[in-house]
Amino acid sequence: PFAIILFLSENLTPSVLTSARIYAGGADYRFELEKFPHLALLTTQANVFAVSDSAAAAGAVATGQKPNNRTLRLEASPAPLPTLLELARKSGRATGIVTNTSLTDATAAAFYARTSDPLDFQAIGLQLVESSDINVLLGGGAADFLPETKDGRRKDGRDLMLEMRNKGYDIVRNQQEMESTPLWRAPKVLGLFNMGQLAYADQVQVSASQPTLPDLVLQAILLLQYNPKGYLLVVDAGLAGKAASQNAGERTLREIASLDQAVAVARKFAGENALIVVAGKQNSGGLRLNGYSFRNDKGAAILGINAQGVPSLTWSTGPGSGQTTTPTGISHSEPSAFATASS
């Protein structure tokens, strides 16, 4: 294939996909990603633990070998394994990373960085600048590239954005600048559209000044398609996992729908000679769909208590669940999609 586009997201479980599908259009609705000719289930255990964390799951996808939890690509093998992006570059392909979280977040970083601390965002940003030959980088996380004197959080005083400009990258900070980039030059582009992660799909006022995930995917395709040997684009739809970790039910479902819109963009604009893969990493929050919503229910109709007095959606674990493995009950006094189950 000329184009290879890999979408990654947390919470692509049957329960969450079913909930998001019903929310988006009812029980008979189908997501674009559900129309693919091939569907499969996959396991995501880490090297030691039966349940993977985000960094280990992303590292497994990036290299094909399961690393340890709480590390970024520290595999069992003694030598670092090449990532999919590195292999793509060696074959002459252009490469890109798109994320609606930060470019230094674990999923995006798994494709270019290697560290024992996936939360050391400043060091990860440095690895991106010092070793990256990635053609297109679009997402959030500008604070990890700027010194404190420029409202960033780098304590070493380095302006990594300036360093990337000196390496030949076009720097874009908003949607207008991104869409004004001359495509015919096939430039290297670093787009940083917020100091932290990008806005959620339901944050209309904030997101109006930022590109959405479908916007980012379209721009990346337009930039990468000029390479005569094709390209590999990795898309991290990370906000679904961020929302789920906070038990934000409707927000989680809207982020899954946003991912599907980005998949639809890829299918439309990548051309017929394209391989598009959508893969889940791990599940956060344990969202469950209970009975019995009606077949035509959609949107807010599935967010509260159903006719039997049972929450349509419940969570297995809630914010702070990293400190406990004991689930607690759901409070029926709250809208179930927003109820927490943390201790």
Over which residues does each language-model region extend?
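A post-motif C-terminal structural segment
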Residues: F2-I4, L12-T18, I22-G59, D105-S343
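Mobile, glycine-rich extracellular loop/lid and propeptide segments
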Residues: P1-S19, V61-A62, K66-N69, E75, ...
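A short, structure-level motif marking secondary-structure boundaries and short turns
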Residues: N68-T71, D144-L146
